[in-house]
């Protein structure tokens, strides 16, 4: 199993740990301390030894930050985690904050005590975030204090060691472009802009540029590493050699100089001396890294990670690999959904369902000689009220049976060498209510509107986001998460800069893979989400039209529960899409499924709906 269902944190230690942290404030010369859910690489997924927020508070979500003051402690989360936060932390110690509308810097400017001294670990905060904090503190006469050591690390006596996951080569057959070509492209751009070098601080960008993958963090196959690429084409990769076997080390030796991570500071300082201009991404690179450049009299040039957009715009090899991975994943999903349909309500638990799905993926991967490398995130397997927790993680404590008359939501994904998948299906268990069916159909309408959208060049994610919500808005409902996130190519299941959300201003470009996942959640009762992955491509021309259009191609093929759809709520075009999607799903997956009973189930699950 690639996931555990054990309880990984508990709220019971929060009070003592916060008290111990506060006890050190005077000696550190601070009045408050920020604890982000981050490591020094500022990635979404972090190794166990960097789960400081969970250790301190009990909150295990993938996004959040705690502000610990002398008499107050606030954990800021986004809409996905409001319910989870309330369940995981001690409410007598911590209050909840709004990470989107009133993040720590906004809260401090409005509520911080005059002259407040805020301590941070400069390795855990990007440069852009530090600027926001400094500006907020200046409004209250406060000071940002950069601490030489993280005070939590001295309190966390059994903190796990740094990971040493093995590095593998991502061959050009999967990557589509040679690493030396990617390095040369970056170097040429640096030279054109009169820059000495760029610091690649995002491990996913390092993995993409050098065509390598790693195993340092759960479910995201990148190595925790940084790189410096010089304008003259030289590349230095700061990667522990204990992670590279003979073949990867020999491969890397042909395209770069591999150095230990401890050499980064000296090499970054060396390229910065005498006014060397070094490009860093202020939204990714730790503030401490920028300070190394400044201390060496170099010039920090802020700009986007040069790999971020090219990594998001998949080449044909990556798109084709993703399509193949999704067919394989769809076959595993069908095997799982068939099994679930045969089980009596009340006899299958949330954990057993997650285990069976992972086993199906492993079995199909073995039969197709494309093994399951990992899951792409911990499976969200939630029944009834648990489905209303957007990022619910079932544990041995919360596990329960999936009962008749309720909705079961399973959001899962896989890592294959040729692609990353992410799919959500909501299933009715036995006879469900008309309210369940109504909201399911409204969510489906939004998903279809995104799937069929046509839009001109220059369209941004925020321009399309309302399409997924209009049907819900008309019913006086909404959902508190984005409609879609970018997805990597055997990399992170959450990839930027592409998104479909209210705040996404990134132009959608051909080759970008995104999720399409509207939902509806009623706390304490039920939750609904339907998710396919899609990619941007050119749309067919319309006779008489004079503007080139883009659209989406669907990558995910898996039946959507017909029993939950009220056909009369769909337009003719929406019903046509639904039936055509099921026809294509049947045609795509039937050749991959050999069990007679599973084939019969797929046939029935994809029959057309009628008014």
Each PLM stretch: what is its role?
Residues 1-611:
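Active-site neighborhoods and metal-handling regions in enzymes and metal-associated proteins
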């Amino acid at each position: 199993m690639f996931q555990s269902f054990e309880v990984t944190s508990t709220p019971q230690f929060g009070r003592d740990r916060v008290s111990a942290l506060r006890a050190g404030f005077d000696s550190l010369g601070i009045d408050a301390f920020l604890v982000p859910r981050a490591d020094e690489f500022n990635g979404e997924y972090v190794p166990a030894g960097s789960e400081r927020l969970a250790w301190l508070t009990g909150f295990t979500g993938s996004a959040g930050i705690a502000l610990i003051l002398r008499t107050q402690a606030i954990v800021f989360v986004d809409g996905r985690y409001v319910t989870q936060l309330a369940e995981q932390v001690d409410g007598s110690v911590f209050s909840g904050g709004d990470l989107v509308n009133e993040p720590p810097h906004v809260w401090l400017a409005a509520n911080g005590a005059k002259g407040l001294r805020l301590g941070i670990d400069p390795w855990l905060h990007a440069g852009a975030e530090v600027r926001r904090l400094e500006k907020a503190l200046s409004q209250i006469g406060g000071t940002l204090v950069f601490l030489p050591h993280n005070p939590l690390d001295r309190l966390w006596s059994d903190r796990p060691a740094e990971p040493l996951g093995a590095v593998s080569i991502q061959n050009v057959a999967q990557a589509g472009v040679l690493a030396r070509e990617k390095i040369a492209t970056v170097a040429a751009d640096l030279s054109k802009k009169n820059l000495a070098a760029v610091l690649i601080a995002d491990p996913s960008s390092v993995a993409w540029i050098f065509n390598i993958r790693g195993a340092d963090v759960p479910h995201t196959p990148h190595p925790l590493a940084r790189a410096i690429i010089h304008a003259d084409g030289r590349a230095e990769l700061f990667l522990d050699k204990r992670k590279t076997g003979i073949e990867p080390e020999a491969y890397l030796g042909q395209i770069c100089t591999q150095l230990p991570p401890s050499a980064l500071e000296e090499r970054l300082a060396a390229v910065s001396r005498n006014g060397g201009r070094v490009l860093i991404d202020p939204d990714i690179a730790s503030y401490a890294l920028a300070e190394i450049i400044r201390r060496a009299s170099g010039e920090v040039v802020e700009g986007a990670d040069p790999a971020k957009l090219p990594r998001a715009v998949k080449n044909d090899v990556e798109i084709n690999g993703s399509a193949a991975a999704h067919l394989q994943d769809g076959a595993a999903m069908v095997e799982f959904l068939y099994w679930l349909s045969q089980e009596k309500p009340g006899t299958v638990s949330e954990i057993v369902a997650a285990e069976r799905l992972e086993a199906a993926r492993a079995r199909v991967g073995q039969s197709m000689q494309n093994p399951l490398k990992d899951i792409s995130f911990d499976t969200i397997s939630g029944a009834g009220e648990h489905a209303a927790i957007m990022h619910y993680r079932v544990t041995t404590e919360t596990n329960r049976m999936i009962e008749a008359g309720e909705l079961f939501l399973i959001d899962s994904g896989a890592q294959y060498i040729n692609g990353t998948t992410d799919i959500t299906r909501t299933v009715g268990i036995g006879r469900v209510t008309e309210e369940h069916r109504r909201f399911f159909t409204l969510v489906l309408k939004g998903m279809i509107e995104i799937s069929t959208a046509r839009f001109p060049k220059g369209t941004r994610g925020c321009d399309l986001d309302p399409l997924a919500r209009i049907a819900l808005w008309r019913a006086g409902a909404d959902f508190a998460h984005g409609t879609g996130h970018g997805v990597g190519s055997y990399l992170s299941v959450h990839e930027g800069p592409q998104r479909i959300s209210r705040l996404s201003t990134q132009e959608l470009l051909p080759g970008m893979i995104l999720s399409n996942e509207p939902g509806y959640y009623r706390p304490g009762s039920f939750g609904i989400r339907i998710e396919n992955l899609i990619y941007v491509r050119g749309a067919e021309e319309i006779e008489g039209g004079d503007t080139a259009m883009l659209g989406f191609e669907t990558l995910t093929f898996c039946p959507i529960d017909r029993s939950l759809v009220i056909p009369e709520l769909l337009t003719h075009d929406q019903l046509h899409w639904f039936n055509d999607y099921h026809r294509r799903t049947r045609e795509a997956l039937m050749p991959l499924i050999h069990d007679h009973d599973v084939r019969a189930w797929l046939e029935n699950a994809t029959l057309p709906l009628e008014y």
